[in-house]
C-alpha cells in the first residue's frame, strides 16, 4: 500500500552485474589515422592492375659498356656508311633482298665484318622480337679514354681545348659536339659515367666520322675531375644563357675546358660553382636559347678564331689600353 510499502528498488541478481565498460583505448581510432591516401591500383598487391603489371616482362636497363645491336635496314646502312665499328652483321634466312640489304652485305664484306645468316626465329629471340626487318648489326662497346690520359694528350699540344658535358642526355647532341670539336681543333670530350649520353651508334653516325678521331673520356665524378684539371692549369668556363661573361669578352688563347649543360636544366649547381667563369652567347632579342650542340659549336668557333690570330705580347696589349 502506498506509504508503508516495503518494496525496494530493483536489485540485480548476484553474478549478473555488468561492471565498468571497457573500451578499445582509442586503438581503433588511431588505427585509422596516418594511413594517407589510397595508393594507386598498380601498387596494391592484390589488385588486378598490380597483377597485370607484375605479369608484364621487364626490359633490362642497358649499360653503357654493353654490346649494342642496331636494327633495321636504314639504321644499319647508315652505320656502315659512317664507318661505325661493328663485329657482325646478322641476316635472317629468306629475307627479301632490296638495294639497302645488298649494300649492307657488300659494305660489311668490304670492311671485314662477319656476316652471319640465321633463322628469323633466332633473330627474333636475339633482338627481343623488335622490328629488325631481317637484319641487325652488332656494335661493340666504345673504348673510352681515361680523363688523365685525355688531359695529358691535350696539354702536349698547347693550348688545350676540351669540352665537358654536364649530364647531356641526347646521343645526337653528343655526336654533333664531337663533330664540332674535330672541326675547330679541339682535343677531346669528357662525359660523366652516369646519367649521360654515351658513344652509341647514334652518336657515332651524328659525328660524321669524328668519333674515330676525337677521344671521349668518362669521369666517375665530373666535378672532381674538373677540379683536378683546373689544378693543372686548365681554365674551366661554363656555358649558360644567364652567364655573367659575354662570349666576346672571353680570352680563348689559354688552355680551356668548355662545360656544356644538359638540354633542359643547363649546368648543375656544383659544376657551375667550380667554373672560373660562366659564359653566355649574345643573341638577338627574339631568340631565347640555342640547342646544346649548336651553342657548343658557336663557342668553339669563336675560340678557334681567336687562336688563329697572332698572339700579341702582353706588354703591347697593356700599352695600347693605356
UniProtKB/Swiss-Prot annotation:
A GO cellular-component term linked to this record: cytosol
InterPro entries: Alpha/beta_knot_MTases (IPR029028), Ribosomal_eL30-like_sf (IPR029064), rRNA_MeTrfase_TrmH (IPR004441), SpoU_MeTrfase (IPR001537), SpoU_subst-bd (IPR013123), tRNA_m1G_MTases_N (IPR029026)
Origin species: Mycobacterium bovis (strain ATCC BAA-935 / AF2122/97)
Residue stretches of biased makeup (Basic residues): 1-16, 43-61
Keywords assigned: Methyltransferase, S-adenosyl-L-methionine, Transferase
Source domain of life: Bacteria
Pfam families assigned to the protein according to its UniProt record, in alphabetical order: SpoU_methylase, SpoU_sub_bind
Region Disordered, residue ranges: 1-69
Repeat in keyword set: no
Entry's EC annotation: 2.1.1.-
Record protein name field: Uncharacterized tRNA/rRNA methyltransferase Mb3610c
Positions with a binding annotation for S-adenosyl-L-methionine: 261, 281, 290
Amino acid at each position: 500500500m502506498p506509504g508503508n510499502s516495503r518494496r525496494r528498488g530493483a536489485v540485480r541478481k548476484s553474478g549478473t552485474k555488468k561492471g565498468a565498460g571497457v573500451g578499445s583505448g582509442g586503438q581503433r581510432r588511431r588505427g585509422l589515422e596516418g594511413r594517407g591516401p589510397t595508393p594507386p591500383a598498380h601498387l596494391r598487391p592484390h589488385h588486378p592492375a598490380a597483377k597485370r603489371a607484375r605479369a608484364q616482362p621487364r626490359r633490362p636497363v642497358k649499360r653503357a659498356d654493353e654490346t649494342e645491336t642496331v636494327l633495321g635496314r636504314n639504321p644499319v646502312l647508315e652505320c656502315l656508311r659512317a664507318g661505325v665499328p661493328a663485329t657482325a652483321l646478322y641476316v635472317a634466312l629468306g629475307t627479301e633482298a632490296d638495294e639497302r640489304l645488298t649494300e649492307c652485305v657488300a659494305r660489311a664484306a668490304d670492311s671485314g665484318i662477319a656476316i652471319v645468316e640465321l633463322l628469323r626465329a633466332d633473330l627474333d629471340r636475339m633482338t627481343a622480337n623488335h622490328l629488325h626487318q631481317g637484319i641487325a648489326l652488332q656494335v661493340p662497346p666504345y673504348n673510352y679514354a681515361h680523363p688523365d690520359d685525355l688531359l695529358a694528350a691535350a696539354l702536349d699540344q698547347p693550348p688545350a681545348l676540351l669540352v665537358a658535358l654536364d649530364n647531356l642526355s641526347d646521343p645526337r647532341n653528343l655526336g654533333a659536339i664531337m663533330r664540332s670539336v674535330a672541326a675547330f681543333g679541339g682535343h677531346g670530350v669528357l662525359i660523366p659515367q652516369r646519367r649521360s649520353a654515351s658513344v652509341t651508334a647514334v652518336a657515332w653516325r651524328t659525328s660524321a666520322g669524328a668519333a674515330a678521331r676525337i677521344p671521349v673520356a668518362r669521369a666517375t665524378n665530373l666535378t672532381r675531375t674538373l677540379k683536378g684539371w683546373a689544378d693543372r692549369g686548365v681554365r674551366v668556363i661554363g656555358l649558360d644563357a644567364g652567364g655573367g661573361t659575354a662570349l666576346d669578352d672571353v680570352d680563348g688563347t689559354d688552355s680551356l675546358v668548355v662545360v656544356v649543360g644538359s638540354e633542359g636544366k643547363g649546368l648543375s649547381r656544383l659544376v657551375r660553382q667550380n667554373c672560373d667563369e660562366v659564359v653566355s652567347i649574345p643573341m638577338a632579342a627574339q631568340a631565347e636559347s640555342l640547342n646544346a650542340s649548336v651553342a657548343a659549336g658557336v663557342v668553339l668557333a669563336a675560340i678557334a678564331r681567336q687562336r688563329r690570330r697572332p698572339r700579341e705580347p702582353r706588354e703591347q696589349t697593356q700599352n695600347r689600353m693605356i
